[in-house]
């Protein structure tokens, strides 16, 4: 079953370390089955409960998955090898259009905002036991959510979108539970879910968001949570349309116990309104990060949700970091209040470059997608070859393997720091690397 490798150890910690180390070293491959617990216990001369504890630890770390009577096996993409490792090393002289970062020229200066926040902190320092939320941040965030039709609910603050998503998942789910996620989708979520000991269930995506039929199938087969990106979906640029939102709400209405998590990380950089699903199920959370519009290093996201979910998130947060710095919260309030970011201008800048690249590719017979945000997704017949040929031509793009499970091969190009005068050159290189072909669905 394991080929040449033999699991060793007498304690649960040693057994799990033996497996995890073998996975990290490539001695146990993704998808490889592990021995049944009783069989391994007999081989090692230990109690079956010891092996069960080791397997439980491995599930919780995202190294293995267990599928009932089919037993346990190494995850197709173990958490020990994060998707961020699937990238192109950018040599000198090659333009990097792969990293997904915002255009730093469109980010606001933080100096004045932090001066104002620090001055207030000097005047009234935040101490242990003080209110963890900045009242003005909560007021402004809730008002913004109300304007966008997000269901009413209490507000919490987390250290970025991924932190918020992790806290919501762990507030409701247990290792072994299944989570429906977009495919292709955000690589960090595809890493996070198995790292929490949860199972990924892929859901196809088109330009209008998750495919309702795939969502229905995933929920019918037992997925206990669904993660949806409202706008600027990474990597495809999809945005949930009004019609798609209505259809997905109808699907979710038949599964009221499913945990719904919406990621609106594109808030502040997109020109399409959101069509939220919030409130379609009993437990839900809606997350908004300031990273793309104001700067990734601020590490702040606002979330709202049903009272039970938000209360659990706040309670667990109190036992860990305690709170997100009120200095940072006050700085974000200052940025909002001062109008430091012109969301329409930022959205127009990204949109102009994105649409120009898609049009240039279409003129060369290359199918590409990017309805919102700063990324363009290009389905390709040979992902490895296309990425390598583009690198040779002087362009580093993101391999689609970082973002997909069952979806077809592709690659992502980030336009945020691309100059308009470069677009024809990029399109020429892509067309040369992948060849022209008829448009097709990318999921």
Where are the model-predicted features located?
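Residue-level detector of anion-binding/catalytic polar loops
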Residues: 64, 178, 199, 259, ...
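AMP-binding (ANL) adenylation modules
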Residues: 402-405
